[in-house]
Swiss-Prot record:
It is found in: Cytoplasm. It is an enzyme of class 1 (oxidoreductase). Keywords: Amino-acid biosynthesis, Arginine biosynthesis, Cytoplasm, NADP, Oxidoreductase. Its EC number is 1.2.1.38. This is N-acetyl-gamma-glutamyl-phosphate reductase. It catalyses: N-acetyl-L-glutamate 5-semialdehyde + phosphate + NADP(+) = N-acetyl-L-glutamyl 5-phosphate + NADPH + H(+). The active site is at C136. The lineage of its organism: Bacteria, Pseudomonadati, Pseudomonadota, Gammaproteobacteria, Lysobacterales. GO terms for biological process: L-arginine biosynthetic process. Pathway: Amino-acid biosynthesis; L-arginine biosynthesis; N(2)-acetyl-L-ornithine from L-glutamate: step 3/4. GO terms for cellular component: cytoplasm. Catalyzes the NADPH-dependent reduction of N-acetyl-5-glutamyl phosphate to yield N-acetyl-L-glutamate 5-semialdehyde. GO terms for molecular function: N-acetyl-gamma-glutamyl-phosphate reductase activity; NAD binding; NADP+ binding. Coiled coil: none annotated.
């Protein structure tokens, strides 16, 4: 007999993020996974696609009414952008107490939904049952900028590079390994959705230029920050370390972080802190796994907090710098 306290279902479980969610939830001591919805995998055992899951569940094809009828304590929507609304409306009508966590961008600009970037917004959580999970790039940008947000002299300029898993499983140029081989693919160089998301959340204009790289997972976000007054590198490092001192998933390191050191980890690494001549410009680099802290891990943080559990329940984190040697920046002060 299950000793789980809360029942949970995933809609859109076939994708990379859905798979990461199943892996995390399988190890959660207070969650019972009761359905996973996927049209492509309909009828197939979940265990056949995710070796960490050892139960008997099979993937189902569930329309919004069928999802609502399950009356799960929690529903996680891991759907492509533009598909969340019918499920939200059905749950609102049939099972309004259900906690909904939406991983798409559909609800990130809706003031009726709590925007769940725990390290920056947990103080505004007051028991909301509708939670919008931030975007992967948006998470990296906000964490890289926030400690200096009030000392900026102009819009942050952010250069982002993501592994192709960020483009999802539906075939496109951005996840075509043949096109990406020996390549870096720029796209949506102005007005990217995450640019608007970060600008709205931080309350300042942000400029963002995303690129897709040949590696599978992980984001490198380089933020160019102009300052109102000169600050020393040490002072800036202290600002970041102090801001995130009580956040176990945020790792402040000295050198620029490398994306291959963050893959399959639940933490964010922020480092470099490279000063330009005159100390009124600093370049900060953040890395995270787009499938974990950029999606599934963050959803689990939000779920845990909403259910009254420790925020890091079932998140296997090791918040310390990697042991592999990283090069120091030649421009660091």
């Amino acid at each position: 007999m299950s000793t789980a306290t809360f029942t949970l279902g995933i809609v859109g479980a076939r994708g990379y993020t859905g798979a990461a969610l199943i892996t995390l939830l399988t190890a959660h001591p207070a969650i019972e996974l009761i359905f996973v919805s996927s049209r492509e995998y309909h009828g197939q055992p979940v265990a056949a696609h995710n070796p960490t899951y050892r139960g008997d569940l099979r993937f189902e094809t569930l329309d919004p009414a069928a999802v609502a009828a399950k009356r799960a304590d929690v529903v996680i929507l891991a759907l492509p952008n533009g598909n969340a609304a019918p499920y939200v409306h059905a749950i609102d009508a049939t099972a309004p107490p259900t906690l909904i966590i939406d991983l798409s961008a559909d609800t990130r600009f809706d003031p009726d939904w709590y925007y769940g970037l725990p390290e920056l917004t947990r103080h505004t959580y007051t028991g909301q049952k509708r939670i919008s999970n931030p975007g992967c790039y948006a998470t990296a940008m906000q964490l890289a900028i926030a400690p200096l947000r009030d000392q900026l002299a102009g819009p942050p300029q952010c250069f982002g590079v993501s592994g192709y898993s960020g483009a999802g499983t539906t075939p496109s140029d951005k996840n075509n390994q043949a096109l990406l081989r020996d390549n870096l693919m720029p796209y949506a160089l102005t007005d990217h959705l995450h640019e608007r998301e970060v600008s709205a959340q931080l309350g300042i204009p942000v400029e963002f230029m995303p690129h897709v790289a040949p590696h599978f997972r992980g984001i490198t976000l380089t933020a160019n920050l102009w300052l109102q007054r000169p600050l020393t590198r040490e002072h800036i490092k202290i600002l970041y370390a102090t801001r995130y001192a009580n956040d176990p998933l945020i790792d402040i390191i000295d050198p620029p972080p490398w994306v291959n050191q963050i893959a399959a980890r639940h933490t964010v690494q922020i480092g470099a802190f490279t000063m330009a001549l005159g100390n009124k410009r600093v370049v900060v680099v953040a890395t995270l796994d787009n499938l974990l802290k950029g999606a599934a891990t963050q959803a689990l943080q939000n779920l845990n907090r909403a259910l009254g559990l420790d925020e890091l329940t079932a998140i296997p984190y090791h918040p310390k710098p990697p042991t592999s040697p990283l090069p120091s920046s030649p421009l660091a002060s």
